[in-house]
């Protein structure tokens, strides 16, 4: 019986040696393709499904796809880059032009022809929820975009200090343009028609709150003074 046990031990040892000496097969899984997600220059959410930025380039397109954009508002006299036009066409994104100065050309100073009509045109697109998700953009995403967003904040009932602070946040070390801030301050919020039933929920809520808190100025007749 001892010999049988010894034989079993020898067989076990041999089997173990074979197991250790057997070549190990490694399954190599190729790495997943790496896709860089880069937001456009000065990109920032404004409200739910409303965004702002500078002009998107091809490197930003994968990022934009994640937003499921329905509309892009382009604030400039010139057309955007061909790549952006093709991207919008390929993904069925509506591109709305809101020319700063419709009579000006590519070399025209945009601030010479800044009109309330151009701003109202952009805002009329923003206040309708069927255009969302929506991106507002211009060349750098600073002054032109900041003007439209600033006027939107006025409609929402923001005070001027808060509007100016948000505008300057995107203007960089040079600071804001006094012309822009004066235009935002003087903007007639009643020039934009808002249908609350078709407006984004956050806008309808803000407008209702602003209207509820509005206190008309007290007027006096000559006889009361």
Curated annotation (Swiss-Prot):
Keyword Hydrolase (UniProt): yes
Location in or out of the cell: Cytoplasm
Pfam families: Y_phosphatase2
Enzyme class: hydrolase
Recorded GO MF terms: phosphatase activity; protein tyrosine phosphatase activity
EC number in record: 3.1.3.48
Tyrosine-protein phosphatase domain mapped to chain residues: 42-196
Comp. bias intervals (Acidic residues): 1-11
Composition skew (Polar residues), residue ranges: 12-24
One biological process term in Gene Ontology: cellular response to oxidative stress
InterPro entries: PFA-DSPs, Prot-tyrosine_phosphatase-like, Siw14-like, TYR_PHOSPHATASE_DUAL_dom
Positions annotated as active site in the UniProt record: 138
Protein name (record): Putative tyrosine-protein phosphatase OCA1
Species this chain originates from: Eremothecium gossypii (strain ATCC 10895 / CBS 109.51 / FGSC 9923 / NRRL Y-1056)
């Amino acid at each position: 019986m001892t010999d049988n046990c010894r034989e079993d031990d020898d067989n076990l040892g041999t089997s173990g040696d074979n197991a250790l000496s057997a070549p190990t097969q490694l399954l190599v899984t190729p790495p997943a393709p790496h896709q860089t997600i880069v937001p456009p220059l000065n990109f920032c959410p404004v409200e739910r499904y409303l965004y702002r930025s500078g002009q998107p380039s091809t490197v930003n397109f994968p990022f934009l796809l994640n937003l499921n954009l329905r509309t892009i508002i382009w604030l400039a006299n010139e057309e955007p880059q061909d790549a952006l036009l093709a991207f919008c066409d390929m993904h069925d994104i509506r591109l709305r032009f809101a020319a700063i100065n419709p009579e000006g050309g590519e070399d025209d100073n945009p601030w010479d022809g800044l009109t309330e009509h151009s701003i109202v045109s952009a805002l009329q697109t923003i206040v309708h929820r069927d255009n969302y998700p929506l991106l507002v953009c211009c060349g750098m995403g600073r002054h032109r975009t900041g003007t439209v967003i600033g006027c939107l904040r006025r409609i929402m009932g923001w005070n001027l200090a808060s509007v100016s602070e948000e505008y300057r946040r995107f203007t960089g070390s040079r600071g804001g343009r006094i012309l822009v801030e004066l235009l935002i301050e003087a903007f007639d919020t009643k020039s934009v028609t808002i249908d609350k039933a078709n407006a984004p929920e956050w806008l309808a809520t803000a407008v209702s709150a602003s209207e509820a808190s509005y206190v008309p100025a007290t007027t006096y007749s000559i006889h009361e003074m």
